[in-house]
Amino acid sequence: MPKKTEQPVSFESSLNELEKIVTRLESGELPLDDALNEFEHGIQLARQGQQKLQQAEQRVQILLSDDPDAPLSPFTPDNDTL
């Protein structure tokens, strides 16, 4: 059976979910396994958010550039950024 493809989540939704994860982790009430799972999900959300911000910054720079024909190119984040 094929996996469901996830719908793209907005930056704001990801940030909201990340804030909830941080609150749960800071409470100190999660069992270790749950805390590790939450942490892993939080890292994924943070990386996705950083990628979206970098893509938005690239678009703004192109829009503000003097070259009206400057192409948008796909962004590939470095794994060392977080």
UniProtKB/Swiss-Prot annotation:
InterPro entries: Exonuc_VII_S, Exonuc_VII_ssu_sf. It catalyses: Exonucleolytic cleavage in either 5'- to 3'- or 3'- to 5'-direction to yield nucleoside 5'-phosphates. It comes from the Bacteria. GO terms for molecular function: exodeoxyribonuclease VII activity. GO terms for biological process: DNA catabolic process. It is found in: Cytoplasm. Pfam families: Exonuc_VII_S. GO terms for cellular component: cytosol; exodeoxyribonuclease VII complex. Its EC number is 3.1.11.6. Keywords: Cytoplasm, Exonuclease, Hydrolase, Nuclease. Gene3D superfamilies: Exonuclease VII, small subunit. Coiled coil: none annotated. Bidirectionally degrades single-stranded DNA into large acid-insoluble oligonucleotides, which are then degraded further into small acid-soluble oligonucleotides. Belongs to the XseB family. Heterooligomer composed of large and small subunits. This is Exodeoxyribonuclease 7 small subunit.
